[in-house]
Structures are given as C-alpha cells and as structure tokens.
Amino acid sequence: MAANRIRPANAPLSKQKSPAPHWRSKVVRILLKTVLYFLIGSVIWVTVLKFVPVWFTPFMIVRKFEAISEGRSSKIYSDWTPMSEMSKEAPLSVVASEDQLFPQHWGFDFKSMVNAFKHNFRGKKIRGASTISQQVAKNVFLWQGRSYIRKALEAYFTLLIEVIWGKERILEVYLNVAETGNMTFGYEAAAQRFFYKPAASLTRNEAARIAAVLPSPLRFSAKNPSAYVQRRTAQIARQMRMLGRVYINNL
C-alpha cells in the first residue's frame, strides 16, 4: 500500500473554487414564488367577488378615515342592490356618460387613451380616459393615486374582471361602488338620499343627474344641481335616448 503523500509545510495551497452565488438564486426563487402566489390569490379574489356582493372598497375606507380625521360624520351610505332590481335607466346612464364603448371593448378604450394623452400633452386641463372596467378595477382592488405600479396593477385587474366577471357583473359592481356624493356610494344610496326613492324607481332624468356628478361627486351635487350639472344631465339624457335600452341588453 502506497504511503500517504505529505504536503510540505511551505507548499502553496491549491486554488479553491469560489462558492456559487446562492443568494441570487434564492432571491429569484422568492420573487417567482411571490409573483405566483399573487397571481393565484388575485384570481381567487376576483372569482369570489363575482358571486359575493362588494360591501366595501378601499376607497370607502379612505373616505371614512378622512372624515374621522376632519371631525365629520364618518357614516358611509351604501346599499348593495342587484342591477336587476334597479331601474333600467341606471346602467344606461353610466354607459352613456362614462363609457359608450363599454359593450364592445375588452376593458380598454385605446382611441380615447391616445386622445387624452394628446390633450394632456398640450398642457390643457387633465382629461381621463378610464373605462368603466378600469374604474371598477381601481376602486375595488387598488388604492387611489398615480404611479406606474398602480396603473400596471389596474390593467391586470381590468383584464381579470373582463375575463372572469363579464360585462354585466362589472356594470353591476360599478353601479354599487361608484362614489355618487359625500360619503355616498352607488345608485341605490344616491336614489334614497337625493330623490327619496329606491333605485328601481329612478326616472331617466334622475339617473342621468346622478351620472352627471360621477366625475367629481364631492364638487357637484345630484340633489342640488348647479347649472353645469343640469346641462350635463340634459346631454346624458339625450345620449341615453340615442343609444336606447337595447344597447346594453346583451352584455
């Protein structure tokens, strides 16, 4: 048996291989798992809300805390009501006012987005181009504010609800969560507070007046309409007549 070789004390050490950067692969795995869990969780979340009433939204919570911090009444007026129990004028009014291509697009109105970009680029008053689907995605699943991350998530949730919910459910949720006045959300609550009747009894003019204040419900009032709101109401009512109820019958 050959004797073991003994390395001289002054012999140079053999070159050791540097350990592989395990931390990088670990970070990548964590990121991939996080993204996967988010995708799975978001799909489950959206699927559940296809069948369960949306009783509250992050935006409602924000409004409540704002009221508390300002010493005002923090009561939220919101009463979930199926769209089938509302006047047919209610869904038609928001489509006529907010998104007339709603039955046709897949969540995004690219032509309006381009026009809004050109308008804003010229330094004029900021104009939005969000569809009803985008507004629902933002109000139900996200926070308020402007950032690329939020816009990316908004686009993601918009596609999800278009695929999982469908148009009718999206419109139903919008009619229940849209801010329609001070601490007031949805058409049912607006009808009760401003017209002293259920949403099922709203006339065309009343539904159009609620829709007229949607872009800025804290600045304008459906109960005490300004001259602008009255003009806008008349415009929306005309658009509703032109579109006709049949326009949203097959969502």
Regions found by a protein language model. Give the residues of each.
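Juxtamembrane regions of bacterial inner-membrane/periplasmic proteins
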Residues: 2-251
